[in-house]
C-alpha cells in the first residue's frame, strides 16, 4: 500500500478500512503562550512541525470560553500546563440567570477564532486540525467551582438549567464560527461523566441533552473526537454520541481499547499512559506500550495517543518514540 495522506489515513481508520499505518496524535498545553492567539498558533504549529502527527488538537486554556463571563485564572506551574481558576463569577444560584449570550467574534472567543485562522493559514492543509470544546457542564463547573457544581445541580436545578441553556447556545455559535476557520472537527471534552461525581440519572438530565445539542452544531465535520475525562467513566452512556473518535484514560480505567471497540462504532484513540510512560518512562517503554495497543486493536479503528493531554514535561525522546512507533519496520 502506498503512503496515505493524513486525512485519508484518519478517514480510513474511522471507517475500519485498511491503512498504510495506524494514525498517531499527541497534544499538549502551552502555558503562557495560550494567553495570546498569535503565540498559541505559533506554538501549536511548531509542535506539529516537530513531530508530524496525523491531526492537530488546538489546546487553549479552558478559560477561553469563560473569560467574557468574568472567569479569571492563572498558571501556577502545573505539569499538565493547565491553569487554576482564581475568580468564579457564579457566586449564587441567581447568577446562572444573569449569564448573557456571547458573540463568538468578540473578546476571548474572538481571540480563539483568530488563533484558528492563523493555524489554518500556516498549516495550509498539511494536517487536519480540531478545536477543543468543553461541554456545557464542564464550563458550568469552572464558572461556579468544582465543589459547588453538585450542590447547585441538586438544590438549584432550574437555575443551573438556565445557565446551561446560555452556555450551550453560546458554544453552538462559537462552533459555527470555528467551522468558517476550517476546523476538521471538535475535541469535545466531557469531565463529569464519572460515577464518582454524578449518577447516570443526573448526567442524563444535566449533561447528555446539552452535549447532544453542541454536537449537533458540529455535524458535517468529519473528525469529531469525544474525550471522556477521568476514571470510572460512563462509557456506555455516551458511546452513542455522534462522533467519529473516542478518547479516554484507557490505561487507567475501563474499558480497554479492545473492549471499547465492542461498544463504539468509530475509532478508539489511546494506548499510551501519560505519566508513568510518557513522562517517567523511556523510549523503549513507549514503543512497548504502543505495540501492545496495536495488538489489542489489530491496528484497526485505532489512533495511537495518550488518554489525555501529554504533560509539558514529557521528554521529547518519548514523544518522538510515540510518533515512530506506528511506522512499519
Features from the language model and the residues they span:
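A contiguous, low-structure linker/loop signature
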Residues: 64-105, 118-121, 125-129
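Segments that shape or occlude catalytic/ligand-binding pockets
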Residues: 37-62, 66
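Active-site loop segments of alpha/beta catalytic cores
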Residues: 1-31, 43, 85, 103-329
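Short active-site-adjacent helix-start/loop capping segments
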Residues: 32-35, 57, 64-77, 139-140
Amino acid at each position: 500500500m502506498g503512503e496515505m495522506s493524513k486525512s485519508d489515513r484518519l478517514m480510513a481508520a474511522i471507517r475500519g478500512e485498511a491503512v498504510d499505518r495506524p494514525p498517531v496524535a499527541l497534544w499538549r498545553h502551552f502555558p503562557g503562550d495560550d494567553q495570546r492567539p498569535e503565540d498559541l498558533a505559533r506554538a501549536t504549529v511548531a509542535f506539529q512541525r516537530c513531530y508530524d502527527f496525523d491531526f492537530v488538537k488546538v489546546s487553549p486554556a479552558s478559560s477561553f470560553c469563560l473569560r467574557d463571563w468574568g472567569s479569571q485564572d492563572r498558571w501556577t506551574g502545573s505539569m499538565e500546563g493547565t491553569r487554576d481558576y482564581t475568580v468564579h463569577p457564579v457566586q449564587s444560584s441567581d447568577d446562572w440567570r444573569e449569564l448573557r449570550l456571547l458573540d463568538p467574534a468578540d473578546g476571548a472567543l474572538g481571540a480563539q477564532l483568530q488563533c484558528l485562522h492563523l493555524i489554518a493559514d500556516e498549516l495550509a492543509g498539511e494536517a487536519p486540525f480540531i478545536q477543543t470544546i468543553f461541554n456545557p457542564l464542564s464550563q458550568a463547573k469552572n464558572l461556579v467551582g468544582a465543589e459547588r457544581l453538585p450542590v447547585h445541580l441538586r438544590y438549584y436545578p432550574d437555575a443551573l438549567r438556565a445557565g446551561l441553556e446560555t452556555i450551550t447556545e453560546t458554544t453552538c455559535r462559537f462552533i459555527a464560527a470555528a467551522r468558517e476557520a476550517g476546523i476538521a472537527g471538535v475535541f469535545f471534552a466531557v469531565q463529569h461523566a464519572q460515577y464518582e461525581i454524578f449518577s447516570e440519572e443526573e448526567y442524563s438530565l444535566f449533561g447528555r441533552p446539552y452535549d447532544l445539542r453542541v454536537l449537533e452544531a458540529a455535524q458535517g465535520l468529519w473528525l469529531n473526537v469525544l474525550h471522556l475525562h477521568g476514571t470510572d467513566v460512563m462509557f456506555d452512556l455516551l458511546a452513542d454520541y455522534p462522533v467519529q473518535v473516542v478518547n479516554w484514560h484507557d490505561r487507567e480505567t475501563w474499558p480497554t481499547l479492545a473492549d471499547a471497540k465492542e461498544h463504539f462504532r468509530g475509532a478508539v484513540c489511546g494506548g499510551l499512559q501519560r505519566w508513568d510512560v510518557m513522562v517517567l518512562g523511556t523510549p523503549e517503554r513507549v514503543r512497548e506500550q504502543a505495540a501492545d495497543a496495536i495488538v489489542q486493536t489489530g491496528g484497526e479503528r485505532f489512533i495511537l495517543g495518550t488518554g489525555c493531554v501529554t504533560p509539558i514535561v514529557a521528554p521529547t525522546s518519548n514523544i518522538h518514540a510515540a510518533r515512530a512507533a506506528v511506522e512499519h519496520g
